[in-house]
């Protein structure tokens, strides 16, 4: 089975080896058809702690690492300018 992958932006790097990644999806409203942006935050395991706030990263679903951590950071796609 292929693991799920998502692309998002790091919004918090305050924890050791852990990053909060915000992933935005654009969905159409069921009744009205208006396009809505929905953002979900994932807790991801960053082994080397290389990512910083604002970086665009790819995360992949994995086995549970802790109570809320089921994703690992695979790669940094784009570094933030700050």
Swiss-Prot record:
GO terms for molecular function: rRNA binding; structural constituent of ribosome. Pfam families: Ribosomal_S17. It comes from the Eukaryota. GO terms for biological process: translation. Gene3D superfamilies: Nucleic acid-binding proteins (2.40.50.140). Coiled coil: none annotated. Keywords: Chloroplast, Plastid, Ribonucleoprotein, Ribosomal protein, RNA-binding, rRNA-binding. CDD domains: Ribosomal_uS17. InterPro entries: NA-bd_OB-fold, Ribosomal_uS17, Ribosomal_uS17_bact/chlr, Ribosomal_uS17_CS. It is found in: Plastid, Chloroplast. Its main location: plastid. Transmembrane segments: none annotated. GO terms for cellular component: chloroplast; cytosolic small ribosomal subunit. Part of the 30S ribosomal subunit. One of the primary rRNA binding proteins, it binds specifically to the 5'-end of 16S ribosomal RNA. HAMAP family: Ribosomal_uS17_B. Belongs to the universal ribosomal protein uS17 family. This is Small ribosomal subunit protein uS17c. It comes from Emiliania huxleyi. The lineage of its organism: Eukaryota, Haptista, Haptophyta, Prymnesiophyceae, Isochrysidales. The gene is rps17.
């Amino acid at each position: 089975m292929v693991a799920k992958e998502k692309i998002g932006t790091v919004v918090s790097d305050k924890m050791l080896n852990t990053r909060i990644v915000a992933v935005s999806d654009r969905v159409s409203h069921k009744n009205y058809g208006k396009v809505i942006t929905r953002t979900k935050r994932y807790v991801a395991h960053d082994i080397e702690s290389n990512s910083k706030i604002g970086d665009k990263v790819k995360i992949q679903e994995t086995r549970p690492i802790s109570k809320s951590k089921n994703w690992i950071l695979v790669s940094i796609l784009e570094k933030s300018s700050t």
